[in-house]
């Protein structure tokens, strides 16, 4: 509603080559860049050109945003963003919520949790908030016990394990390397986006998925520089990305491995 007016005005501005009508967003390839591309037509109707810059790690999208090379990024959940700001003294903000991706435990050399041998190897992500998430999932699976008070907002590590009855060898690995680690470890706890890139679906392929209440704590957000949340570009991006068409695309494409929250 009201879109046609802003669309015609914006299109006229875009035809003049106005760089303010180009929205540059950094994203990891799956599902983030794919979801962004599903919103391109809606942005074009509003007179904006969407430029998606793909990254394969979790650091460069934020540093590029801080440096002004991007208008926004879309790859991280709120606990990771908060932790990044804390560790780097940056001031990035969550502009709006998009989706969550359930973590899963996947079979590597061992086919099931019940078959795990004493001393079996388990790979988990090595960055703070995602390591916490993985450890909580291992606890839910009955494989370890963590110190009292550890919850999804904590910054837990292996040192917070108080009981490890199977003497699991828990290996901290860069999140993007986890799918490749499956050939070398008994189990791996894998982030939803990297699982999808490896053709793994948490809802269908994992041995166990995380508690939905925990998963919702890790809502993936579109982030921008603090103070720009209400800028024309960010608001146009929000309108396009939180559309019914994008929701339908996510539901039909990812079949429960990506869950929208709008």
For the regions a language model picked out, list residue spans one by one:
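Short helix-initiation/N-cap motifs at beta->coil->alpha
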Residues: 52-63, 151-180
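A conserved helix-loop-strand patch within extracytoplasmic ligand-binding domains
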Residues: 95-144, 247
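Periplasmic-binding protein-like
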Residues: 132-139, 241-261
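A bilobed periplasmic-binding-protein/Venus flytrap-type ligand-binding module shared by bacterial periplasmic
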Residues: 102-113, 218-231
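Short, well-ordered beta-strand elements
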Residues: 18-30, 48-54, 121-122
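Alpha-to-beta junction loops
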Residues: 66-76, 120, 143, 165-169, ...
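Bacterial lipoprotein signal-peptidase II cleavage site
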Residues: 1-20
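Ligand-binding "clamshell"
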Residues: 83-95, 109-110, 184, 189, ...
